[in-house]
Each structure stands twice: as structure tokens, then as C-alpha cells.
Swiss-Prot record:
Specifically methylates the uridine in position 2552 of 23S rRNA at the 2'-O position of the ribose in the fully assembled 50S ribosomal subunit. It catalyses: uridine(2552) in 23S rRNA + S-adenosyl-L-methionine = 2'-O-methyluridine(2552) in 23S rRNA + S-adenosyl-L-homocysteine + H(+). The gene is rlmE. SUPFAM superfamilies: S-adenosyl-L-methionine-dependent methyltransferases. The active site is at residue 180. One of its GO terms (molecular function) is rRNA (uridine-2'-O-)-methyltransferase activity. It comes from Caulobacter vibrioides (strain ATCC 19089 / CIP 103742 / CB 15) (Caulobacter crescentus). This is Ribosomal RNA large subunit methyltransferase E. It is an enzyme of class 2 (transferase). Its main location: cytoplasm. Its EC number is 2.1.1.166. Belongs to the class I-like SAM-binding methyltransferase superfamily. RNA methyltransferase RlmE family.
Amino acid sequence: MVKPPAGGNEGGRGKPARLKTAYGRTPSQQAWLERQINDPFSAKARALGYRSRAAFKISEIDDKFHFFSKGAKVIDLGCAPGGWLQIAVERGVTTLAGIDLLPVDPVAPAHLLEMDFTADGAPEKLLELLGGEPDLVMSDMAPNTVGHRETDHLRIVGLIEIAAEFAIDVLKPGGAFVAKAFQGGETAEIIGKLKRHFDKVQHFKPKASRQDSSEVFLVATGFKGR
């Protein structure tokens, strides 16, 4: 963890902290580190023991849509580093399973699978860990970007589509689907399919999402069945 320079931003006030440029660090990496240090949600996440600022995003989404409850079964796609799972457990969910390519430190009582969700057999293994149909499928999956706008867009759309197809295949009636998206990052075809299977489909941008980011969340509620 990178610590801000002593006295550089005491009490969250004053001038933003600046880091000395480390050898081998690119300008974009430097900017990202400085943004993390000065971001109030990142600082709050560290103070409260959450693994990422994304915990506040799912908190706001749940405050509005009320997904998490003691009896709910929840699947988290792209669950690293575990912030969404932390909030789900904190709000009473006891049956949940997460999957990610990256290793995730335990978040009891969640079952964790270190695997590519798009790999053969991954969805089946995840459902087996959960022990039944989920009430909520949530996806924070994001592709590795290559810097080519059209290619990155197609990768984003592809992951949203995969997550949506999975949700439609496995959800209980009345269930819900939440996925990270980007403005203009999903096709009319995906939205149309979700509208055929859910009572309501909408976009939601939490305050914890950076305002200069195109990040939004696709929220589909009232699953009508396959």
C-alpha cells in the first residue's frame, strides 16, 4: 500500500498529495497512484477495512434496490479483491459464491473460485459451490484493455453479454442482475434481451463512481423466467 507523504494532506484537507516519480513508472501509473491517494472513497475504504472503493458502489446500489438479505443466494462475477462480497456479508447474506482470475483473500462465509469465468465448466462449478439457484447475479468483470477503442469496446460488451446470459440461465424467478457497464458500452440487443426477461432494466451511477468516468451499472430486477 502506498502511503501519502507525511503532512501532505493532513485530515483530508490542504493540497493534494504528490508522489515522487519512481524509476520505471509510467505517467499513467503515476497519475493513478496519486488519484488513489487523494480519492476520499479510497481513503474511507482503507479506514473501514474494505478492500476497495468499489464496496461503496455496491452499497449505494443495494441502498436503492435492496438486494441483500439473510436468505438470499448471491453470485459475484469478477469478485477480486472482495469488496462487493464484504458488503453482501455485512448486510446479512450467508450463501454466496465468487469467481475471479485473480486470487482473493477469504471473505467468510463466501465460497471462492480462482478461475476464468469464461472457461469450460466454470459456471457449473460456481453453481455447485453456491448450492442452488441465485437470487442475485452481480458482475464487476472488466476486460484487460489494449488501448484500441473499438477492440476495448467489443471486449466490454462481450463480458456484459456473457454475464447477462448466465444470469438469465440460472436466476430464480423474481431475481436480479447487476453488472458494471460503461455509457454506450452495451448494445441494444443486450438491453432488449434483458427487457424480455426482467420487469425493469435501468442504469444507475453511484456517487462512489468517479464523476469523470463513463462507468455506470446495469440493473435488471424482477426476473420473469427463461
